């Protein structure tokens, strides 16, 4: 009896550890609007004819038709001895296929390391980073360099683009918490994406946008300070654009900017009005296996002090010089 009791305690101990680590229960045939996920990004993988959806939380969902999904699966494997620590928060993960491999761009936060305190806000060690895998469903593991961006500045929401010079780049946000005017920046990556080259360059600032607004202490309307969720695209006419998200007072909203030079260096000209309805944002674009261009975003609402975010799809048209949102898409 004592042996059985000891074995039971051991099993319960392992169960507690797994529960604390947040090992997810895999579910099948889950409708898209039943999934709670911030920053959804979908890779349509031609080889497997499968859609892979990532986002905040370091988890992955799989679907054959965009209607129902299987998951979530844990696919990100980080180095506990790196700056991320043993249990980093993972935000805004994206999958990109490049030169025969799959890359996992995401934001990692080490809550045990504080780099600064500004205006009463504690700023933790946070940065965009890249993992790699030979398969779209992972596992995604670290590469050569464990630091892509400066450790003393919080960065987030890194995405991927190959510019007209043929070089790969990470485009990311300099978080507003430190300078109260968030930035959009680029940094060159090594040819195999295993690290960065040189220093980052500011492309534009949150205050450059005509549509994102907030109120100061006196209630005056001023430019919003947040930059969030960049995604690069090129229209069928060759126009380089960037989706990005901020706020219009209390609404979470997505806008778009276009590069006059057709390169990452811009200058970036912002559209006067947001491209999506209020409280839809952090979007990205992908084509279905049938060739339809879709935008994945999450809806945003606050409920009892918590954010509720659900993935949604919009059909879009890129046949002209400007991206046009047609409307909600139901698979």
Residue locations for each model-derived region?
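Carbohydrate-active catalytic/glycan-binding domains of CAZyme proteins
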Residues: 19-331
């Amino acid at each position: 009896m004592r042996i059985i009791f000891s074995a039971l305690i051991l099993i319960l101990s392992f169960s507690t550890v797994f529960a604390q680590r947040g090992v997810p229960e895999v579910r099948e045939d889950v409708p898209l609007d039943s999934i709670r996920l911030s920053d959804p990004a979908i890779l349509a993988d031609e080889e497997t004819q499968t859609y892979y959806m990532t986002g905040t939380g370091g988890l992955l969902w799989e679907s054959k038709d965009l209607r129902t999904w299987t998951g979530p699966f844990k696919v990100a494997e980080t180095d506990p001895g790196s700056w991320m620590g043993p249990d980093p928060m993972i935000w805004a993960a994206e999958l990109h296929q490049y030169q025969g491999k799959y890359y996992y761009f995401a934001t990692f936060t080490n809550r045990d390391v504080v780099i600064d305190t500004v205006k009463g806000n504690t700023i933790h060690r946070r940065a965009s980073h890249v993992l790699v895998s030979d398969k779209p469903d992972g596992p995604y593991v670290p590469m050569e360099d464990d630091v892509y961006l400066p450790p003393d500045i919080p960065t987030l929401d890194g995405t991927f683009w190959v510019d007209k010079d043929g070089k790969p780049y990470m485009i990311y946000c300099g978080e507003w918490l430190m300078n109260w005017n968030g930035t959009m920046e680029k940094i060159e990556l090594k040819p195999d994406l295993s690290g960065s080259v040189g220093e980052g360059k500011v492309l534009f600032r949150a205050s450059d946008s005509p549509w994102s607004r907030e109120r100061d202490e006196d209630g005056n309307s001023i430019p919003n300070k947040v930059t969030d969720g960049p995604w690069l695209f090129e229209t069928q006419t060759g126009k380089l654009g960037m989706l990005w998200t901020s706020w219009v007072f209390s609404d979470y909203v997505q806008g778009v900017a276009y590069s006059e030079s057709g390169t990452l260096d811009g200058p970036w000209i912002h559209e006067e009005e947001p491209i999506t309805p209020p409280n839809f944002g952090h979007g990205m674009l992908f084509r279905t296996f049938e060739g339809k261009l879709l935008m994945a975003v999450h809806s945003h609402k606050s409920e009892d002090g918590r954010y509720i975010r659900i993935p949604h799809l919009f059909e879009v048209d890129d046949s002209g010089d400007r991206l046009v949102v047609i409307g909600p898409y139901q698979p």
